Structures are given as C-alpha cells and as structure tokens.
C-alpha cells in the first residue's frame, strides 16, 4: 500500500513533514471531502470488508467510500504511516429512537497525540454530525466548528461527544416533518473510552451491522460527503443537502426525491462513485438523518 496513492486519492499535496495540528486538520478535511461515508456495497449485494488491504483497494484504487470501520481504519493507517502518534479507539453510538448508547462497540475513531496534547479525529460519522477539525480531548469545553459546536465530556473514564446545532430552514415543506430531518438542537453522538483497540476488535460488529435487522445499515442505504459549504447525503432515493450558516445561525436544508436514473447520475457527479453492480436504494424504518 502506497501512501502517495492515498494522498492522490484525497487530493492532498501539502507538507507531510510537519506533524502538527495544522497538517492533521488538513489531512482530515481532504479525506472527508474526497471519501464518502457510505454503505452502498451492502445494497449492491456485496460485503463490506474489514481488512486494511481490502479497504485500501476499495477506497483508494476503486475510488469508493465506506463506513467507519473502513474509512477511519484507512485514516488511522495513513496518519500512522506519516509518523503521527496514533491510537485506535472504539465508540458506542447514541441511538435516538431509544434514547441510549449502543450496547455494542460499533464505531471506530482515532486518537492522535501532538506535543502531549490528545485529539480525537473522525472522518466517518457522516451527515451533519461530522467534525471538520480534530477535537481536543478536554472535558466540558465547547469547540465551535463550521458544522456546529462540539463538546466532549468525561465521566468516570468514559467520554461523551455531543453537538449543539443551529436553527434550520427547510424550503420544501413536504419534508419539514420528515424522519430524515434532525430536529434536535442538542444531539448526543457517541461515547468512547481511551482503551486502545485493534481492527480485530471490530470483526463481530462488522458482520452484525451487515446482517442484523436491527442495523440501520441493513434498513437504509446511505451516502454522505462533506463539501466546502456543508454536506450532501443520499438516503434511500432522497437527495439531501445542508448548507451550514447560510444566514446568521441558520442552516439551509434541502430535499429532492430522485428517480433511478437520477440516482446513478448523482452518485457519479456529487459523490464521485461509479458502481459495478446493480444498486437497490432502501429507506426502511431505521434511517439516517441530515
């Protein structure tokens, strides 16, 4: 696996010698704007593979995206290869409909240490919950970013990531009450500990997320990519976009239902994805939100 091929895939052309916060931020932002957070393979009858070589081939060579077990695994590898001090961590996603965190460790994230300061780096949460900058591992501190205000809180060795969101404007009244629209201004995202993990720790959940009827990845097809102004998502056959702060403290959220032909075109033009097999969009009871 070639780190230069990775840099080309994410469009990163700047310094690889300065292992500082600015470089870390640039790599994160290049990856999140080049590599979609998506589960389309599952809805094309293909498996989501866990191994690093398979992930590199899928994302770098085939120019696809993936979910956190792939996308953040690749980021972890790249940052380590560059010389950053990295630790793989595992997270428990907050499940809004049941108001609790997942019982299984379903999210992979990365800790990076720079000059004795620890940062959380995550390029694979997707939608409008995606951080645009590394988060300093400090409890109780509001960390404003373009998407929202993020806050990390530590309690008895467990860290909690929350998000404080803006007001939102939805011009298409048909979708004002849609289950695709995030309606909370204060949003719990996930919890995690600082216990080091390996990719093997995620083998069970990699299978579970692809097979369990309780998995949102089984219920709904999803593709999300950050842009310079916000984020675009394809949820089932609905194209959604959120433009951050399009006016003072208000996000613009737009929705459009797509035909089968339009979906193929949008995947290519908006997300840079050309699928090899037939894609069957799915919007079940369990959905992602924008």
Swiss-Prot record:
Chief location category: cytoplasm
Pfam families: Acetyltransf_2
Signal peptide extent: none
Keywords assigned by UniProt, alphabetized: Acetylation, Acyltransferase, Cytoplasm, Transferase
GO MF: arylamine N-acetyltransferase activity
Binding site for CoA: 103, 208
Active-site residue list: 68 (acyl-thioester intermediate), 107, 122
Record EC number: 2.3.1.5
GO BP, sorted A to Z: liver development; response to thyroxine
CC per GO annotation: cytoplasm
Compartment list: Cytoplasm
Reactions catalysed, as given in the entry: an arylamine + acetyl-CoA = an N-acetylarylamine + CoA
InterPro entries membership: Arylamine_N-AcTrfase, Arylamine_NAT_domain_sf, Papain-like_cys_pep_sf
Binding site for substrate: 106-107
UniProt-listed Gene3D superfamilies: 3.30.2140.20
Family listed: Belongs to the arylamine N-acetyltransferase family.
PANTHER family: ARYLAMINE N-ACETYLTRANSFERASE 1, N-HYDROXYARYLAMINE O-ACETYLTRANSFERASE
Protein purpose: Participates in the detoxification of a plethora of hydrazine and arylamine drugs. Acetylates both arylamines and arylalkylamines.
Stated name of the protein: Arylamine N-acetyltransferase 1
């Amino acid at each position: 696996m070639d780190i230069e091929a990775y840099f080309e895939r994410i469009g990163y052309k700047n310094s690889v010698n300065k292992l500082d916060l600015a470089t870390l931020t640039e790599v994160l932002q290049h990856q999140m704007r080049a590599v979609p957070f998506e589960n389309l393979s599952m809805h094309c009858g293909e498996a989501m593979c866990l191994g690093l070589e398979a992930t590199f081939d899928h994302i770098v060579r085939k120019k696809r995206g993936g979910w956190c077990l792939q996308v953040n695994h690749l980021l972890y590898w790249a940052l380590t290869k560059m010389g950053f001090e990295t630790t793989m961590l595992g997270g428990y996603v907050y499940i809004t409909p049941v108001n609790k965190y997942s019982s299984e460790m379903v999210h992979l994230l990365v800790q990076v240490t720079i000059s004795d300061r620890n940062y959380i780096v995550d390029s694979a949460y997707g939608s409008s919950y995606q951080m645009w900058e590394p988060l300093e591992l400090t409890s109780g501190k509001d960390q404003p970013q373009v998407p929202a205000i993020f806050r990390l809180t530590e309690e008895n060795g467990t860290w909690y990531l929350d998000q404080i969101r803006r007001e939102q404007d939805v011009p298409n009244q048909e979708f004002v009450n849609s289950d695709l629209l995030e309606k909370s201004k204060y949003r719990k995202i996930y919890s995690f500990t600082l216990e080091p993990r390996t990719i093997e720790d995620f083998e069970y959940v990699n299978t579970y997320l692809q097979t369990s009827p309780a998995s949102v990845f089984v219920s709904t097809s999803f593709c999300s990519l950050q842009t310079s102004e916000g984020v675009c998502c394809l949820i089932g056959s609905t194209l959604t976009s959120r433009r951050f702060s399009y006016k003072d403290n208000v996000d613009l959220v737009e929705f459009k239902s797509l035909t089968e032909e339009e979906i193929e075109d949008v995947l290519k033009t908006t997300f840079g994805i050309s699928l090899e097999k037939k894609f069957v969009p799915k919007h079940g009871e369990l959905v992602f939100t924008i």
